[in-house]
Swiss-Prot record:
GO biological processes: glutamyl-tRNA aminoacylation
Residues at which ATP binds: 252
Protein name: Glutamate--tRNA ligase 2
Keywords assigned: Aminoacyl-tRNA synthetase, ATP-binding, Cytoplasm, Ligase, Nucleotide-binding, Protein biosynthesis
Coiled-coil zones: none
Motif annotated as 'KMSKS' region, chain positions: 249-253
Gene3D superfamilies named in the record: 1.10.10.350, HUPs
High-level lineage: Bacteria, Pseudomonadati, Pseudomonadota, Gammaproteobacteria, Legionellales
MF terms (GO), sorted A to Z: ATP binding; glutamate-tRNA ligase activity; tRNA binding; zinc ion binding
SUPFAM superfamilies with a match to the protein in the record: An anticodon-binding domain of class I aminoacyl-tRNA synthetases, Nucleotidylyl transferase
Coarse class of the protein's main subcellular location: cytoplasm
Gene label: gltX2
One Gene Ontology term, aspect cellular component: cytosol
Amino acid sequence: MMKSRFCPSPTGLMHLGNARTALFNYLFAKSKDGIFLLRIEDTDVERSKETFDLGLQEDLRWLNLEWQEGPGADEGNGPYHQSKRQAIYDDYYQRLEEADQAYPCFCSEEQLRLSRKIQRSAGKPPRYAGTCRSLSAAEIEKKKAEGLQPALRFRVPDDEVVVFADLVRGEQRFQTNDIGDFIIRRANGTSPFMFCNAIDDALMGVSHVLRGEDHLTNTPRQLLILQALELPVPTYAHIALIVGPDGSPLSKRHGSRGIKELRDNGYLPLALTNYLARLGHYYASDELLSLAELAKGFNVESLSKSPAKFNAQQLDYWQKQTVNQLPNDDFWEWAGSELQSQIPTDKDDLFLTTVKPNVSFPRDVAYWVNVCFGKTLNLETAQSELLRATGNRYFEEAFEAFKKFGKDLNSVVSHLKEKLNLKGKPLYQPLRIALTGAEHGPELAKLILIMDYETIQNRLQEACQ
């Protein structure tokens, strides 16, 4: 059975790049009636935190990316936290050492740094120089007796080519002479990503590894490990990374935020999944799609090789589409029951049909609740100046027109046009700002029907002051 996986490190909060990788793996699995696996790669003891671990799982559940295998869903391949799998890795280290495919390395970080510097100055790519590659058993024991703790390096074969088919990028070829022997166990005994990631994919039956292109150069190393241990090799697909509009790595200055922050600000999970699913993947439909529909339309061949540019406006577009299709009960659960409680029952439906297409976040709903039912508006300086420049007569005539015609906006506007000889923006804008505090928004005629007559009178009187 097809099995994809998402394996974050709990060293920070989930960001958009993580979320997109998780989403693509989820959609890939669902498109093939496969299994989506979650594994927590927490071998970085110093930086890994339980709060981040739980936060990552909470974010995935909020996005409705439920895993069929992983923490809380053991299918016999656990544990699913790498910090609890060290005995498994130690067994494979022993196998590699016994087969002379790995050897202890006593080089200090200072020695390695100097070696890299010399190689770069000679115009060569930095790789391990092989200082400890041919140490005898006696030399190894002597160094250990001196109290030196070795790392363990994988012995990369010379003069070979590692070839694999990437589902996104086609055939990939790497010369082993360019790779160099690499560390598979740190001197402190812990396992780095390179090793345990590959071992776990094989042991957990992962058939497809879909990950960022920043892992592309890790793949030949992991293939060498799996081949040396005669373990199953998954199919790889390396997706383009998300970048800012200027092509630089995505950051907060581009408007990128963590999933928790987006959730706290009122973004909806379906908005995020619709945006992220299209960020580097083509969908024929430009309609808001459910997760099941996104999965049905997902195809690895539709993934772009080019970097995907983050666009905050596009994310907000999908947010607005998602809000607009929310059932009324879900809308108020999202916006907040305390806001709903401020709306008279007989005006609830009219408020929703009028305001819903114009809001994207709970703060927008709060704004229009205050417009329709609040006592005062907080005008910006420019708006106050516009009302002053309009002059009191405009608002006095508007006051009289509402007394005469009630909430018939067309008649009120016709009255102002006739009395003041106005048209266009000078005719409509002052009235909208005086009544709503906004230059744009829901249809004014409908907002007026929602407002109490007293509210309309008070705001016109305030505009005269």
